[in-house]
């Protein structure tokens, strides 16, 4: 089958012909229809320090997908050939304390599809049935292909009560933009998103934010004053991994505010802990998606009218994957989809 493989320990991704994956009695085999390129895939393509320390070579990459079931393991229940599906890309052990307590997103033994085990940038993917999400008919193929990152956004955006609250989002990448759409959809008052990338800030405006702020040219404090906010932001969603953005967020928070951290800093990051302690801030780290409550909620939000389509900016046939990766890496895009 056709696949995109990290075949060498150097920058790049290579298209190769590899065997169709075998599947076990508790697995399903999925015919891949659409995939989306993630920031993780760009790290792997670039072969940065994280990728060098994490990715076994060779490795079929990719973890954001839409497809249809073509084979079902003999012990699988509740799924059948022909169903439209996406899937959870974190494979958990099922036996640790958190897994047994129903908190699989906190499994210490997690393996990542397209990271530690073969991924979805291929014509077929074998996946444990427990990780497969059967899709309602009113979820489109494009929406299904980005449910994984949409789930990151939902997990973060729903970490704290945002109804009637003023929300600050630092980082207007695709996940930050989708988080902005979510908090607006569920009842936040003012939603402010910051970045230094004007292209992505414009995408955020299309998603209905109150203000999209380029912090190179405008101060957050001025924006808050213009919106009539006298006491700071109630909820902060840090999506950028930028140390300066994180500290700007701490300064902008109201006393007793809540901060969810999804962005990953590139190095050890100094924080002004006086902002945290004397303001009584609550900080929560966010990783992946809650299994599977986040999946239920994000599909329900799409069914109830949440529109995330503006974040999908490019579609390419898989044979044009090199150009697709370049577009995604440029920062001048939202989500980039490969059609198989």
Swiss-Prot record:
It is an enzyme of class 1 (oxidoreductase). Keywords: Cytoplasm, Metal-binding, NAD, Oxidoreductase, Zinc. Its main location: cytoplasm. NAD(+) binds at residues 175, 195, 200, 262-264, 286-287. GO terms for molecular function: L-threonine 3-dehydrogenase activity; zinc ion binding. The active site is at 40 (charge relay system), 43 (charge relay system). It comes from the Bacteria. It catalyses: L-threonine + NAD(+) = (2S)-2-amino-3-oxobutanoate + NADH + H(+). Zn(2+) 2 binds at residues 93, 96, 99, 107. Its cofactor is Zn(2+). One of its GO terms (biological process) is L-threonine catabolic process to glycine. InterPro entries: ADH-like_C, ADH-like_N, ADH_Zn_CS, GroES-like_sf, L-Threonine_3-DHase, NAD(P)-bd_dom_sf, PKS_ER, Zn_alcohol_dh. Zn(2+) 1 binds at residues 38, 63-64. Its EC number is 1.1.1.103. Pathway: Amino-acid degradation; L-threonine degradation via oxydo-reductase pathway; glycine from L-threonine: step 1/2. One of its GO terms (cellular component) is cytoplasm. It is found in: Cytoplasm. It holds the Pfam family ADH_N. Binds 2 Zn(2+) ions per subunit. The record marks 148 as: Important for catalytic activity for the proton relay mechanism but does not participate directly in the coordination of zinc atom. PROSITE patterns: ADH_ZINC. Belongs to the zinc-containing alcohol dehydrogenase family. Catalyzes the NAD(+)-dependent oxidation of L-threonine to 2-amino-3-ketobutyrate. Homotetramer. This is L-threonine 3-dehydrogenase. The gene is tdh.
């Amino acid at each position: 089958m056709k696949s995109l493989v990290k075949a060498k320990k150097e920058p790049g991704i290579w298209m190769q012909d590899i065997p169709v994956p075998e599947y076990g009695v508790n697995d399903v085999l999925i015919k891949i229809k659409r995939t989306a390129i993630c920031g993780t895939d760009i790290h792997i393509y670039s072969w940065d320090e994280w990728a060098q320390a994490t990715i076994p070579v060779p490795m079929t990459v990719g973890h954001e997908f839409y497809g249809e079931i073509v084979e079902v393991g003999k012990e699988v229940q509740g799924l059948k050939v022909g169903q439209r599906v996406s899937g959870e890309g974190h494979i958990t052990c099922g036996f640790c304390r958190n897994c047994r307590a129903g908190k699989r997103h906190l499994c210490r033994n997690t393996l990542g599809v397209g990271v530690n085990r073969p991924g979805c940038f291929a014509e077929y993917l074998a996946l444990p049935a427990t990780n497969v999400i059967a899709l309602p008919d009113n979820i489109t193929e494009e929406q299904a292909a980005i449910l994984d990152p949409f789930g990151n956004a939902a997990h973060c955006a729903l970490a704290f009560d945002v109804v009637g609250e003023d929300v600050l989002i630092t980082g207007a990448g695709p996940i930050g933009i989708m988080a902005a759409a979510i908090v607006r959809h569920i009842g936040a008052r003012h939603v402010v998103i910051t970045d230094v990338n004007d292209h992505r800030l414009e995408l955020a405006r299309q998603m209905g934010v109150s203000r999209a702020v380029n912090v190179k040219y405008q101060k957050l404090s001025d924006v808050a004053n213009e919106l009539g906010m006298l006491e700071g932001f109630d909820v902060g969603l840090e999506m950028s991994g930028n140390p300066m953005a994180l500290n700007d967020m701490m300064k902008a928070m109201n006393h007793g505010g809540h901060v969810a951290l999804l962005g990953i800093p590139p190095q050890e990051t100094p924080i002004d802990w006086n902002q945290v302690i004397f303001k009584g801030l609550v900080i929560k780290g966010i990783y992946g998606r809650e299994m599977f409550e986040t999946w239920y909620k994000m599909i329900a939000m799409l069914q109830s009218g949440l529109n995330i389509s503006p974040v999908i900016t490019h579609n390419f046939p898989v044979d044009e994957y090199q150009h697709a990766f370049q577009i995604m890496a440029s920062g001048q895009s939202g989500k980039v989809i490969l059609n198989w």
